[in-house]
């Protein structure tokens, strides 16, 4: 979340990547020493793609440029089982630099969840069901990032890289479903086990060309990227020891990206920029369901489907910046993006095409009051496009009584964003960075829950089946205040805090149900690094998230603390580190969902304390 908004766009080396989209575990498995820096951009200029109404998070992967042969090696071991080894190597001789980052990991991630659902039966007594899930994800994999930089001359360079990621996991989830009476006495029990195998691999090829046209900063760059990904997942579900269902899901993805930017300084205080960008994506999902018929798993053609999703984004931008009296700075830009989508259900020959064009103006202003004090203002228009899972209309069974179904007619969400910022730096190494922001979004995408009118029989009891589906429900207004404080005392103490307070207002109606709601929430982060006697570094990370509420749900807040101790050895050529994640063993999430037909109370644990 960025400022309480889950619509931030994550980039790898300034470009979109399937590594983030398909295999969300990639970010979690990426070792810290493979990352050079992380850029957070809350008011992007027209140079950046318009995707991401919550801003941009850009992860820059490390590539050392030191002369000669250089390298580092890192090994980790932890409990619950967690082991990894990673390396960073580069060799530079004259005009050519070769670099490599690699990592190999093997770990277990336990988790659990529990919930109770009450179904209202009019004048009849309510029906109660509880669910208790225990899961264990055993994952292993590796990634390799190889590349080169060729400095052809003082003004020309060529960078090429190849990234390969291989991920596999074996997941076991045990779900105990109990029918209860109004006094919570158990009437019936059924146990479901879900055995899931998951294999993902991704190949990414990158090429970057940069040419300085003069010594005043005139520059042209060209970026090319090609990716192909494959994901295979098999899930076998048994009930009370008897196989009841099997699901095979194969996803093949291919994407291509090209971008070119031109920068032209005009005098000492003006600059003109322009660029183009084309991005394409082609995903095919083969989803097959097998049911137990006479103790034989037979494909259910009514629940199986082949789904194709194609997307092409064509964009162009221009922006002009000027600095006046070394005090005022202005950056004005305009970006246009055309999106062409094809949503195809190949099994039933159902095709949908969506063509959308949007204009995205940006304006950024800066006032340098003194060398230590700055005021900023930013405006931008952004877009959030629904991704492939949200537009796939074919139902996917989550549990016997819960279905997910996408919506092929979803429109993108457009947002207008305003940001006021103030930065004050003190000579005592104390910095205040604060901002007030406002965002208004139209056609906001929300997930609703409805009854399908169908029932599932569980231990002889007919239980209503509900479906979760995304719709363009509402207009959303978000107003917030953010305060960042940082203090550095030499090399021995460094502390950073972030406090975010925001109000969210939603207005929307669907099927005569009013979803209007106003909610105030907040978050707090602290990162404190202190050098103890013996040159032992002690780092504390604290995260607090306030409660949240919508018209049909409530979620509790979350609190966690991570600790780390490190000591440099062998004349600072090696480092020994101890990490403790979730010190109090309470990181999790609790949510209540309610409507006229049922009430659900659900609690989820992300994992457990680890070291």
What are these regions (language model features)?
Residues 1-19:
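Extracytoplasmic beta-strand/coil segments of soluble accessory domains associated
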Residues 15-42:
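Short acidic/polar hinge/loop motifs at secondary-structure boundaries
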Residues 23-26, 52-73, 85:
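N-terminal periplasmic accessory domains that precede
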Residues 81-112, 125-172, 197, 201-203, ...:
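Transmembrane beta-barrel wall of Gram-negative outer-membrane proteins
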Residues 230, 296, 340-342, 371-417, ...:
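Surface-exposed extracellular loop regions of Gram-negative outer-membrane beta-barrel proteins
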Residues 246, 255-259, 301-305, 407, ...:
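Outer membrane beta-barrel strand-and-loop segments of large Gram-negative receptors
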Residues 305-312, 354, 383-433, 440, ...:
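Outer-membrane beta-barrel signature, preferentially recognizing the C-terminal barrel domain
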Residues 567-611:
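C-terminal beta-signal and adjacent terminal beta-strands/loops
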């Amino acid at each position: 979340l960025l400022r309480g908004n889950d619509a931030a766009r994550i980039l790898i080396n300034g470009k979109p990547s399937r590594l983030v989209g398909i295999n969300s575990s990639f970010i979690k498995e990426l070792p810290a020493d493979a990352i050079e820096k992380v850029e957070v951009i809350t008011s992007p200029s027209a140079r950046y793609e318009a995707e991401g109404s919550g801003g941009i998070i850009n992860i820059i992967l490390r590539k050392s440029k030191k002369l000669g042969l250089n390298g580092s090696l890192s090994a980790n071991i932890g409990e619950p089982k967690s082991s990894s080894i990673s390396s960073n190597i580069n060799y530079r001789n004259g005009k050519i630099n070769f670099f490599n980052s690699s990592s190999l990991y093997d770990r277990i991630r336990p988790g659990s969840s529990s919930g109770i659902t009450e179904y209202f039966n009019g004048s009849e007594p309510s029906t109660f069901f509880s669910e208790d899930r225990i899961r264990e994800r055993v994952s292993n994999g590796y990634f390799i990032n190889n590349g080169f930089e060729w400095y052809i001359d003082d003004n020309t360079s060529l960078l090429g890289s190849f990234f390969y990621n291989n991920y596999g996991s074996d997941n076991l989830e045990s779900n105990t479903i109990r029918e209860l009476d109004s006094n919570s006495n158990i009437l019936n029990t059924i146990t479901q086990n879900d055995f899931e195998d998951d294999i993902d691999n991704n190949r990414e090829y990158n090429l970057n060309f940069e040419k300085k046209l003069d010594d005043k900063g005139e520059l042209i760059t060209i970026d090319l990227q090609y990716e192909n990904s494959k994901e295979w997942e098999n899930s076998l579900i048994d009930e009370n020891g008897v196989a009841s269902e099997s699901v095979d899901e194969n996803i093949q993805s291919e994407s291509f990206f090209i971008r070119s930017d031109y920068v032209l300084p005009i005098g000492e205080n003006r600059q003109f920029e322009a660029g183009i960008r084309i991005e394409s994506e082609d995903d095919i999902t083969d989803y097959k369901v097998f049911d137990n018929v006479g103790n034989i798993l037979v494909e259910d053609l009514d629940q199986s489907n082949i789904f194709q999703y194609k997307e092409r984004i064509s964009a162009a931008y221009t922006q002009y910046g000027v600095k006046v009296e070394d005090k005022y700075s202005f950056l004005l830009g305009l970006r246009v993006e055309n999106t062409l989508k094809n949503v195809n259900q190949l099994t039933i020959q159902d095709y949908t095409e969506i063509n959308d064009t949007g204009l995205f103006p940006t304006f950024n202003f800066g006032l340098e009051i003194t060398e230590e004090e700055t005021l900023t203002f930013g405006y931008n228009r952004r877009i959030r496009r629904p991704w492939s899972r949200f537009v796939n209309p074919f139902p996917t069974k989550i549990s016997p009584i819960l279905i997910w179904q996408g919506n092929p007619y979803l429109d993108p969400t457009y947002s207008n964003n305003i940001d006021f910022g103030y930065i004050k730096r003190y000579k005592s190494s104390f910095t205040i960075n604060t901002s007030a922001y406002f965002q208004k979004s139209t056609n906001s995408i929300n997930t609703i829950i409805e009854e399908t009118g169908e029932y599932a029989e569980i231990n002889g009891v007919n239980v209503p089946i509900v479906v979760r589906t995304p719709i363009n429900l509402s207009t959303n207004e978000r107003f917030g205040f953010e305060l960042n404080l940082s203090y550095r005392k030499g090399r021995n103490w460094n502390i950073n805090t972030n406090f975010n307070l925001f109000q969210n207002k939603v207005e929307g109606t669907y099927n005569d149900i009013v979803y209007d709601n106003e909610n105030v929430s907040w978050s707090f982060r602290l990162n404190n690094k202190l050098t103890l006697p013996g040159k032992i570094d002690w780092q504390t990370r604290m995260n607090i998230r306030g409660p949240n509420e919508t018209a049909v749900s409530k979620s509790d807040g979350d609190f966690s603390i991570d600790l780390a101790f490190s000591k440099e050895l062998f004349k600072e050529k090696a480092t020994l580190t101890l990490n403790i994640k979730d010190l109090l063993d309470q990181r999790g999430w609790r949510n209540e969902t309610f409507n006229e037909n049922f009430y659900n109370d659900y609690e989820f644990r992300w994992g457990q304390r680890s070291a």
